[in-house]
Amino acid sequence: MRVHSLFLKDFRNYSELRLELGPEMNSIFGLNAQGKTNILEALYILSLGRSFRTSRLTEAIRFGSSHFFIEAVFSQNQVFHTLSIQVDKRGKKILFDGAPITKLSALVGLFPVILFSVKDTTIIEGSPAERRRFLDLLLAQASEKYTGQIALYHKALDQRNAAIKTQDYKTIAAWNSPLIAYGSLVALLRYECAKKLHKIFQNLWDNTLKETLSLRYESSLITTESPTLNDIASNYYEQLRLANTKDFELGYTTVGPHRDELIITLNDLPVSKFSSEGQKHSLLAVLRFAECVYLQEEFLIHPLLCMDDIHACLDQNRLDQLFQLSTSLGQTVTTSTICPNHLDSNSSIFHVTQAQVSLVTSNFL
């Protein structure tokens, strides 16, 4: 994917902005609170229909305005598309090439964006649910079918849990089959994704910090290195049977992919407990790079890589190494308080001050 232009209207501190992006590295610099991160937030909202900074999109409406409007012109496989979103107090309106999108599940994957943010450490420090969500979002960007599978699994899980609470044995039995069918596929797809990410992650990490890194998907349903869907389904059936008494005691389903974990270790130690802040930020940055490589290699998808406030959390040595990696990933947008001096001739540099964006240098625009 190549993003050609971004238009903002009454979004955050921008009354109006039209930004033409270069095809490779786009570096945006300026003092704090000038509007740098707002540009990345707008791109992220177009990708997923939600913000990484607030749970309420109406908070992004510029003070005194009734709504905000974001639009991007981009191309995939040399075909141009337009994607826009308008948000007001009544809700949001999303258009793709002029046609309305009414479900966010249909939006995911149309405009793939991978975001690295200094504040986004929940994948490393957060609960297992955060890491499961990380895998689910990556798989959803690659395939709309996965979004449907995970939704069907959670529907079956919710129905089974409701039946457990009322001790409705007949309904529990009825939901076991769809729970096993959808859950087994979710577990297999996550496992395969994590396995491929591990190899990519190791290669990228070895090229930067020369430390031993491991990423693996841990599931009670998967007991072999190369599981089949039937293997997982058989294990799930047996584990549900054995967990019946425990499920009734606790009031919910205790086995399944909703209990699985993505384990990340550095030098055989959990990164959440034994890594420095610098290591965590470097690891997270490389993990985002690995997502891009995974989408490119497995699905021929070239997402936009966005990196926010990079000088705040990465030292110059790590920055140089990561920027060297980014040259092979396609289009990238970064923000920083420091004017970049490490970029090559294929870069576009923008300066932001009080919501005014000016082009400093570019060989493309």
Swiss-Prot record:
<protein>
    <recommendedName>
        <fullName>DNA replication and repair protein RecF</fullName>
    </recommendedName>
</protein>
<dbReference type="InterPro" id="IPR001238">
    <property type="entry name" value="DNA-binding_RecF"/>
</dbReference>
<dbReference type="GO" id="GO:0006260">
    <property type="term" value="P:DNA replication"/>
</dbReference>
<feature type="binding site">
    <location>
        <begin position="30"/>
        <end position="37"/>
    </location>
    <ligand>
        <name>ATP</name>
    </ligand>
</feature>
<dbReference type="Pfam" id="PF02463">
    <property type="entry name" value="SMC_N"/>
</dbReference>
<keyword id="KW-0227">DNA damage</keyword>
<comment type="similarity">
    <text>Belongs to the RecF family.</text>
</comment>
<dbReference type="GO" id="GO:0009432">
    <property type="term" value="P:SOS response"/>
</dbReference>
<keyword id="KW-0067">ATP-binding</keyword>
<keyword id="KW-0547">Nucleotide-binding</keyword>
<keyword id="KW-0235">DNA replication</keyword>
<dbReference type="GO" id="GO:0006302">
    <property type="term" value="P:double-strand break repair"/>
</dbReference>
<keyword id="KW-0963">Cytoplasm</keyword>
<dbReference type="GO" id="GO:0003697">
    <property type="term" value="F:single-stranded DNA binding"/>
</dbReference>
<keyword id="KW-0742">SOS response</keyword>
<dbReference type="GO" id="GO:0005524">
    <property type="term" value="F:ATP binding"/>
</dbReference>
<dbReference type="GO" id="GO:0005737">
    <property type="term" value="C:cytoplasm"/>
</dbReference>
<dbReference type="InterPro" id="IPR027417">
    <property type="entry name" value="P-loop_NTPase"/>
</dbReference>
<dbReference type="InterPro" id="IPR042174">
    <property type="entry name" value="RecF_2"/>
</dbReference>
<keyword id="KW-0234">DNA repair</keyword>
<dbReference type="GO" id="GO:0000731">
    <property type="term" value="P:DNA synthesis involved in DNA repair"/>
</dbReference>
<keyword id="KW-0238">DNA-binding</keyword>
<dbReference type="InterPro" id="IPR018078">
    <property type="entry name" value="DNA-binding_RecF_CS"/>
</dbReference>
<dbReference type="InterPro" id="IPR003395">
    <property type="entry name" value="RecF/RecN/SMC_N"/>
</dbReference>
<comment type="function">
    <text>The RecF protein is involved in DNA metabolism; it is required for DNA replication and normal SOS inducibility. RecF binds preferentially to single-stranded, linear DNA. It also seems to bind ATP.</text>
</comment>
